[in-house]
Amino acid sequence: MAGRLWGSPGGTPKGNGSSALLNVSQAAPGAGDGVRPRPSWLAATLASILIFTIVVDIVGNLLVVLSVYRNKKLRNAGNVFVVSLAVADLLVAVYPYPLALASIVNNGWSLSSLHCQLSGFLMGLSVIGSVFSITGIAINRYCCICHSLRYGKLYSGTNSLCYVFLIWTLTLVAIVPNLCVGTLQYDPRIYSCTFTQSVSSAYTIAVVVFHFIVPMLVVVFCYLRIWALVLQVRWKVKPDNKPKLKPQDFRNFVTMFVVFVLFAICWAPLNFIGLVVASDPASMAPRIPEWLFVASYYMAYFNSCLNAIIYGLLNQNFRQEYRKIIVSLCTTKMFFVDSSNHVADRIKRKPSPLIANHNLIKVDSV
């Protein structure tokens, strides 16, 4: 018997939504014979996670965007992709997450099916946009470090903006089929309107492969080649001919590598569950514990607030710009002033953006 999809048992959405939205497949992991009553501590925990994620996501990613806008040292071709990633993270914090929080408070979905569709659409747009932006960052780093002679031509200001436009065009194209297949549904286990893995096994496998596994393999390839080149230069080249590896540049590269690793860790469990369920829905779905399904989703949700924190912890330029922005909030007229124009700032700090145009290794290899 299919579990009730809208809200708590017996709950129905307001409005006249498509009947496809009102059903959940028997194969949905954890669906069982209905939605079981949730203990109050679980709802409180999920609500706390969402509140923290929303606040840190909005504040942190706005700081990232404003930092790049205010500081000329951070306005470079590589950081265009960082801003793209920040925008992708902001998408979920301003609409889908607040609606999920409202569902937790109300113990069910209380809005129309249109809000559900829009929430699920923005959720997918954010996820795929994040994946493609992280892939764009990795390719940018690979070209900058391993093919430095051609980097300036490949990543001119105009070209970089075109790449970001391509990223979001592909993201939009990738998410539109969800509206046609009917995979954007409300799931009471996670209090969210999101991609439903059990609607179509073939489509779920295609989504996981092309929207997660393939992009992550591209990122892994890029970073492995970068690490190989860095290690080769550091350990196998004679000291006399060894190019200088600037510590600050290396930390900048590590920052983006950490962003990728955390994204992969947070999203891998959910994608793995999707593949397992899609491989044999009838037998595998009932074996997925509900707590694991819920935990994998909220781990993925939590990732949207991590990137801005990583930049602040690992990158001095962003950390200092964060501090300036927070202080300048008290002086409105100074808020949108280019902070890199201050004489004292130019004296105290050397240029060292998160993704700089100067390279770790001045060789054109790999």
Swiss-Prot record:
Membrane topology according to the record: Multi-pass membrane protein
Ranges in the topological domain labelled Cytoplasmic: 67-79, 140-158, 225-256, 312-366
Keyword Cell membrane carried by entry: yes
Transmembrane segments: 46-66, 80-100, 119-139, 159-179, 204-224, 257-277, 291-311
Extracellular-facing ranges: 1-45, 101-118, 180-203, 278-290
Cell location: Cell membrane
Gene Ontology terms: cellular component: plasma membrane; receptor complex
Glycosylation sites: 16, 23
Ranges in a coiled coil: none
Disulfide bonds: 116-193
Pfam family, one: 7tm_1
GO biological-process terms attached to the record: adenylate cyclase-inhibiting G protein-coupled receptor signaling pathway
Keywords: Cell membrane, Disulfide bond, G-protein coupled receptor, Glycoprotein, Membrane, Receptor, Transducer, Transmembrane, Transmembrane helix
Entry GO MF terms: hormone binding; melatonin receptor activity
SUPFAM superfamilies: Family A G protein-coupled receptor-like
Protein purpose: High affinity receptor for melatonin. Likely to mediate the reproductive and circadian actions of melatonin. The activity of this receptor is mediated by pertussis toxin sensitive G proteins that inhibit adenylate cyclase activity. Possibly involved in sleep induction, by melatonin activation of the potassium channel KCNMA1/BK and the dissociation of G-beta and G-gamma subunits, thereby decreasing synaptic transmission.
Family affiliation: Belongs to the G-protein coupled receptor 1 family.
Protein name: Melatonin receptor type 1A
Organism: Ovis aries
